[in-house]
Design a protein with these regions (language model features):
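Active-site anion-handling motifs in enzyme catalytic cores
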Residues: 1-390
């Protein structure tokens, strides 16, 4: 099948130099990332580096087909060109749109509505989810309601992040809706199972090689976690995803100052952010633009821990145990669907002896039940793809 893949990209799409019609032109190298300006630009391009896992997972699920990734910006920039959309409709049999928490009050899907209205082929929306449950329909922007209306009227398939999104879309009249979870969950199933097996180990509460993830620049929660779990002479490794553009983690130097070491993925420039004075451990800030480098680094950790879904999934893809702290409905929907062990943020935050609580929690995990649930979800995902013809 000739598949048009668009939406959230994998890290490989960082090499795209130009697009002409349906021909994508790639550079034989990645953009240089060394200065403050370079670093911020690379984060801004993807908005959140965790998104690369979504695009990568979607692409991997289409292996075996004739797949072309066309950047969504190319379709958007040429939405008034009948010639280009005639070419797209002629050359592809199916469109797969890699998505995330598109159903949210702060995002209006006007462009998606306009573009999908121009496609004559069926559309698969893969990985669509919500940000917050409360008042969802009443708060969705007009552009997003139009997007749903367009897809309701054509042959469309929705693979959702979880049950709530699926229920919501069915209420909107969508015919083919399957809760499948994020496609990143099925990128490397054997390693995911290895990670889940390793997690049921109380000794991990004493681990010192931990990759932390959270919302540095906004709240101090991750700093508190590091102090609770790490010994005074240990180094806290914090993985940045979108904090440089969304959560006021600022680089203080000039635009041309060296701020990033690509080999180690370490931010070397001086930073400034809320609560930074509270650190009582040495720490490093890391940011990855290559998912293979990211997985390689996580494979050397004892544990991935924190409030970022994909910041933990990348570790699981490397076979490293990972435990998430659920902070919002978006995370809860995905975690409840896939059945991974997790701790509610409100519960974790009020624990005074976090290390003891963690050891007790890990010791109670039913590994076989967790793996059985994951395997069932993977089978469900493959089955949904097969029903679509993928």
């Amino acid at each position: 099948m000739r598949i048009l893949l668009t939406g959230i990209p994998s890290y490989l799409q960082r090499t795209i130099a130009d697009v002409s019609g349906t021909t994508v032109i790639h550079r034989p190298y990645f953009d240089e990332t060394r200065t403050k300006k370079d670093l911020i630009a690379q984060v801004r391009k993807i908005a959140n580096t965790g998104n690369y896992l979504i695009g990568e997972g979607a692409a991997e699920s289409l292996r075996g087909h004739n797949v072309t990734y066309l950047p969504f910006w190319h379709l958007a920039n040429n939405r008034d060109s009948n010639e280009i959309f005639e070419q797209v409709n002629r050359e592809f049999d199916l469109c797969v749109f890699a998505s995330a928490n598109l159903l949210r009050p702060g995002y209006s899907a006007d462009l998606e509505a306009e573009i999908f209205a121009k496609l004559t082929m069926p559309v698969v929306v893969m990985g669509i989810g919500i940000q917050r449950k409360e008042g969802l329909k009443d708060q969705l922007p007009a552009g997003t309601l139009k997007f749903l209306d367009v897809l309701r009227k054509k042959e469309s398939f929705f693979l959702t992040r979880g049950y709530f999104t699926a229920e919501f879309l069915r209420e909107q009249g969508m015919k083919f809706v399957k809760p499948t979870g994020c496609p990143s969950l099925y990128f490397s199933p054997n390693d995911m199972k290895r990670s889940l097996t390793a997690l049921a180990n109380p000794a991990l509460a004493e681990a010192q090689k931990i990759a932390f993830g959270g919302y540095l620049g906004s709240v101090a929660d991750t700093i508190v976690d590091a102090h609770a779990l790490l010994k005074p002479d240990s180094v806290a490794s914090y993985v940045v995803q979108d904090e440089l553009v969304a959560y006021n983690l600022s680089l203080t130097g000039g635009d041309t100052d060296i701020a990033y070491d690509r080999s180690s993925a370490r931010i070397t420039g001086a930073t400034e952010y809320k609560h930074s004075e509270k650190w009582q451990r040495k720490y490093e800030l890391l940011v990855y633009f290559d998912t293979n480098q990211w997985r390689g680094a996580m494979s050397e950790r004892d544990l991935c821990f924190g409030r970022r879904f994909h910041g933990c999934i990348i570790g699981m893809q490397a076979g490293t145990p990972a435990l998430m702290i659920a902070v919002d409905d978006r995370m809860r929907e995905m975690l409840e669907f896939i059945g991974f062990p997790y701790i509610e943020a409100s519960t974790w935050n009020r624990e005074t002896d976090k290390r003891a609580y963690l050891a007790n929690f890990l010791g109670k995990i039913d590994t076989q039940a967790v793996i059985d649930r994951y395997s069932a979800c993977e089978g469900n995902f493959r089955s949904a793809l097969a029903q679509i013809g993928l």
